[in-house]
Amino acid sequence: MEIGPNHRFKDVSYIESPNQSGPFAPELPDTIVIHYTAGASTESAIRTLCDRKRKVSAHLVVGRDGAVTQLLPFNIVGWHAGRSAWGERTSLNRYSIGIEIDNAGQLSERDGCYESWFGRTYPAEEVLHGTHRNHSEASYWHRYADEQLEVVEAICAALIQRYGIQYILGHEEIAPSRKIDPGPAFPLDSMRTRLYGSPLA
Ligand SMILES: [Zn+2]
């Protein structure tokens, strides 16, 4: 994954979202925030993230097949983190690049079927039974595709190299009272271990 002088990945489709603030302050961004879309398709996620009325955006969207779409250059502040805090920092949009991954999120089990909040059912092999880091009991989660996990790790490695990213965080870690993405199906701790040598954010 190669990043050009215009702060965009080369060979990646680009659709610019109008939902953006100005450039980052000097020395920033130094953080990546990982999200899932909790939606029905990559196309609908991109539509939402480019809709002025919705007032949300992200720098990148990763489809189920691993295809990447960039919506903002990496030097521009996006609107993905919302009310959030990490250490002494608040409003993490000012510090971070947002990556949205196409995934249905938490699923509910009924008679051996697993259903998303928008009513689609998923086969057992696409479902993980696991405990969220912010919860005490296990529940059901849509698995990420291997292609998605591979490309997200490659994206993070490229952003670390280009921008000196120091923190890779889940939305669930910076807004634990209101967000549960990317959830236990995303191997955040093992990815941080591979990239930084430690599972800790
Ligand atoms: Zn999120």
Language-model regions, residue ranges each:
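Active-site-adjacent loop/helix surface patches within enzyme catalytic domains
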Residues: 2-166
